[in-house]
């Protein structure tokens, strides 16, 4: 509760605060990094030991960039208001079965130490079990996209650096001022002003009636691995 205003905490019943804390603890007790935990439910006193007029979202994921922002964006896209958001990063040790062995001091390092992000949110109440499941699935898909982008961020940045270097040597039929503007823009992107999410490579092959755009399936990085351009034959011809 470190990031929650005291005024908000004092408005909650102690039993509900204890209940949601124990619920999050149960999520933390066992974890497989290959299968991030996402749970969306309507707290019920009989089932969960606490209650809320909102739906609860519990998330446990290996700590990587963009997690919180991605959750917010997906919930906003679906029209859910966020009433409570708690996010904590833990340094932990687990055994080979994923069972929690130790919570270490913040930022602790070591070969057997994992950094894990635990999130708890309360959002507009979902009206049915089906809606809860749909939201769980949507958040899992969002995290899958985040992992793709994070895993390939450095390779995508390297591709951008290659392109920037190529511009210094390329003999292009464009005005010098225009080419210089492109170079400056590429350098600005590479100076940590842009988050690379996906990469796809196209080449142009000459043909008798003009040219053809060739889509390199092996070039895909980041989100492009799941969100492909999917050019149709009519889209690849250049007159």
Give a label for each model feature.
Residues 1-58, 73-76, 84, 88, ...:
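Charge-rich interaction surfaces and accessory domains that mediate macromolecular binding and assembly
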Residues 60-66:
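Short, surface-exposed ligand-recognition loops at beta-strand->loop->(often short) alpha-helix junctions
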Residues 64, 125-128:
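Helix N-cap motif at beta-to-alpha junctions
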Residues 67-72:
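Ser/Thr-Pro-rich, acidic low-complexity intrinsically disordered regions of eukaryotic RNA-binding
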Residues 81:
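Residue-level detector of anion-binding/catalytic polar loops
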Residues 88-106:
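Beta-rich nucleic-acid/ligand-interaction surfaces
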Residues 104-118:
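A structural-propensity feature for long, helix-poor, extended segments
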